[in-house]
Amino acid sequence: MSRLPVLLLLQLLVRPGLQAPMTQTTPLKTSWVNCSNMIDEIITHLKQPPLPLLDFNNLNGEDQDILMENNLRRPNLEAFNRAVKSLQNASAIESILKNLLPCLPLATAAPTRHPIHIKDGDWNEFRRKLTFYLKTLENAQAQQTTLSLAIF
């Protein structure tokens, strides 16, 4: 008997689009693939022309600290959700940002500083800060996944 039908069936079972939808009771670990896809999609939109003349990664140390602080992940996402409303042609990013909240872990303590500030209508600043924020989320999730695998 050929193994091809079995392999095709297995492939269909593990494809993300054919799996059961995520629910409130689904652990966040299993939904990270979806979160990673959303982050990648936002970054793709952020790289659309016109590209800024400024360096994407040129953020001051204070902004970097605010964007990397674990307890500010949710307040920072709220700041990006407010800022995206002042931008033109950013509806695709806005809709994805709204769905990103379940990807963020709960804060372990109250924030000790204010969330990131983004100038209204400043596409380049929004793009630089959001790109840094999303890369920080990806790195944190990669570390969490590595720790989880090391435990097992």
From Swiss-Prot:
Which coarse location class describes where this protein primarily resides?
secreted
Under InterPro entries, the record lists:
4_helix_cytokine-like_core, IL-3
Gene symbol here is IL3
Q: In which tissues is it expressed?
A: Activated T-cells, mast cells, natural killer cells.
Quaternary organization:
Interacts with IL3RA.
Q: Name one Pfam family in it.
A: IL3
The family line of this record is: Belongs to the IL-3 family.
Where are glycans found on this sequence? N34, N89
Q: Which domain of life is it from?
A: Eukaryota
Q: Which UniProt keywords apply?
A: Cytokine, Disulfide bond, Glycoprotein, Growth factor, Secreted, Signal
Q: Which GO terms describe its cellular component?
A: extracellular region; extracellular space
Cystine pairs annotated here are C35-C103
Entry protein name: Interleukin-3
Q: Does the keyword Disulfide bond apply?
A: yes
Would you kindly state one Gene Ontology biological process term found in this protein's UniProt entry? nervous system development
In its UniProt entry, the species of origin is given as Homo sapiens
The signal peptide here is 1-19
